Swiss-Prot record:
It is found in: Endoplasmic reticulum. Disruption phenotype: Glossy stem wax. Major decreases in primary alcohols and wax esters, and slightly elevated levels of aldehydes, alkanes, secondary alcohols, and ketones. This is Fatty acyl-CoA reductase 3. It comes from Arabidopsis thaliana (Mouse-ear cress). SUPFAM superfamilies: NAD(P)-binding Rossmann-fold domains (SSF51735). It catalyses: a long-chain fatty acyl-CoA + 2 NADPH + 2 H(+) = a long-chain primary fatty alcohol + 2 NADP(+) + CoA. InterPro entries: FAR, FAR_C, Far_NAD-bd, NAD(P)-bd_dom_sf.
Length: 493
């Protein structure tokens, strides 16, 4: 990265630019598109890569599933009846698939247009399930990343590729985690032999074996999930998601040639802080399900180290960092990594979550389906895996063993009940196993590169207010109590 401090104008950069957005149906991508349409009307074109779904074309998906979201209400208020004209002029829907070579483009004329018109590509496509099927995660997060890069290389005018990854490609590292790239084949535990081509071959061979024996769809899914977790843990990553995202980084980082590349690593992404309005969110994250589960009276304990730092970042700040990094790095023919998080400059301990959940639901208690107000009480904190196992044993496992014994004595009279509770408890243990690395995470994400990026835009006055992403401005109590939880309850739960 250049040592000379520059001043970046995002609006000037976006003027007359054509941008390909990959993974356009996703949470961040929607906010990215809305932001550009709202603040940069002089952008030339946004090409949105979407897959057609059963019974719906890519264009129908955009109109029915994306544009009708509350997220776009500010844009609708701004443009009124002219919004349709704006979207028809500025947006081109591209029917494609990141998992396929050339992004699965079937429209030759459109592909030709994009190859000669696109100035920048932002890859926001990802499957974020920790235990996703290995074939699916590898196809999207790893090989899909390569497909996007290869398409970028074909584009005559492309000056920048922004690949959005995750800060947690670091696995379970502790201490200060630097903004450094992965070498091809690098592993977290030193185990040698990581070969992405072999991983691809392994997946295909396993799928072929399952199909030959006529395995049921459920068996194929579970086998693929287990394979992904095994391969991830073999090389030191805690789950399939971060393992395949790390391999995706390896792919684009080592094969980019002279293309300018931004690897943007956000931490845990939460609801919008300010724009287009506070509290917009989609999907369920660990901290969200814990807080709301407690408020609904379904959760009586939290499992985490209260003194560990939780790194969260509002979605609009992440989108702003993407826009600024794109403008700052276009045409520089280098690779740079940005951690976009809060743990270094505005750390928040895990202890905040149970405290704020109690404060919120004490003042605004949840009303259940029967119309009864759910009163919350003090929550039990399990500060280690040992205390969790002890809690589960006393509260559930002893009773389950008793039920199993009675079931055997009475010739499986209670088999249905036993299987139900056994499955439920096993599911809890599986969830805890998946999330444990983040409930007891002891890393702090260095963001030296990102801080330089903030300084570049901070000198531009109006744009500093427009493209904010400094975590130091966040008051965590105010954000969670008056923005995030309200958004969760309105849009998700």
């Amino acid at each position: 990265m250049s040592t000379e401090m520059e001043v970046v104008s995002v609006l000037k950069y976006l003027d007359n630019k054509s941008i390909l957005v990959v993974g356009a149906a996703g949470f961040l991508a929607n906010i990215f598109v809305e932001k550009i349409l709202r603040v940069a009307p002089n952008v030339k074109k946004l090409y949105l890569l979407l897959r057609a779904s059963k019974g719906k074309s890519a264009t129908q998906r955009f109109n029915d599933e994306i544009l009708k979201k509350d997220l776009f209400k500010v844009l609708k208020e701004k443009y009124g009846p002219n919004l349709n004209q704006l979207t028809s002029e500025k947006i081109t829907i591209v029917d494609g698939d990141i998992c396929l070579e050339d992004l699965g483009l079937q429209d030759f004329d459109l592909a030709h247009e994009m190859i000669h018109q696109v100035d920048a590509i932002v890859n926001l496509a990802a499957t974020t399930k920790f235990d996703e099927r290995y074939d699916v995660a590898l196809g999207i997060n790893t090989l899909g990343a390569l497909n996007v890069l290869n398409f970028a290389k074909r584009c005559a005018k492309v000056k920048i590729l922004v690949h959005v990854s995750t800060a947690y490609v670091c696995g379970e590292k502790s201490g200060l985690i630097m903004e450094t790239p992965y070498r091809m084949g690098e592993t977290l535990n030193g185990t040698t032999g990581l070969d992405i081509n072999y991983e691809k071959k392994l997946v295909q061979e396993k799928l072929d074996q399952l199909r030959v024996i006529g395995a049921a769809p459920e068996t194929i899914t579970e086998t693929m999930k287990d394979l992904g977790l095994r391969r991830a843990k073999m090389y030191g990553w805690p789950n399939t998601y971060v393992f395949t995202k790390a391999m995706g980084e390896m792919m684009v980082g080592t094969k980019r040639e002279n293309l300018s590349l931004v690897l943007l690593r956000p931490s845990i992404i939460t609801s919008t802080f300010k724009e287009p309005f506070p509290g917009w969110t989609e999907g369920i994250r660990t901290i969200d399900s814990l807080a709301v589960g407690y408020g609904k009276g379904k959760l009586t304990c939290f499992l985490c180290d209260l003194d560990a730092v939780s790194d969260v970042m509002p979605a609009d700040m992440v989108v702003n960092s993407i826009l600024v990094s794109m403008a700052a790095q276009a045409g520089k023919q280098e690779e740079i990594i940005y951690h976009v998080g809060s743990s270094l400059r505005n750390p928040m301990k895990n202890s905040k979550f149970p405290e704020l959940a109690y404060r919120y639901f004490s003042i605004k208690p949840w009303t259940n389906k029967e119309g009864k107000v759910v009163k919350v009480g003090a929550i039990e904190i399990l500060s280690s895996m040992r205390s969790f196992h002890r809690y589960m044993t006393i509260r559930y496992l002893i009773a389950l063993k008793g039920l199993e014994l009675v079931n055997i004595i009475l010739c499986k009279l209670f088999e249905k009940e036993f299987q139900y509770f056994n499955k439920k408890i096993n599911f809890i243990f599986r969830l805890v196993d998946l999330y444990q690395p983040y409930l007891f995470f002891y890393g702090i994400f260095d963001d030296s590169n990102t801080e330089k990026l903030r300084k570049m835009v901070s000198k531009t006055g109006v744009e500093n207010e427009m493209f904010y992403f400094d975590p130091k401005v966040l008051d965590w109590d105010d954000y969670f109590l008056n923005t995030h939880v309200i958004g969760l309850l309105k849009y998700v739960f």
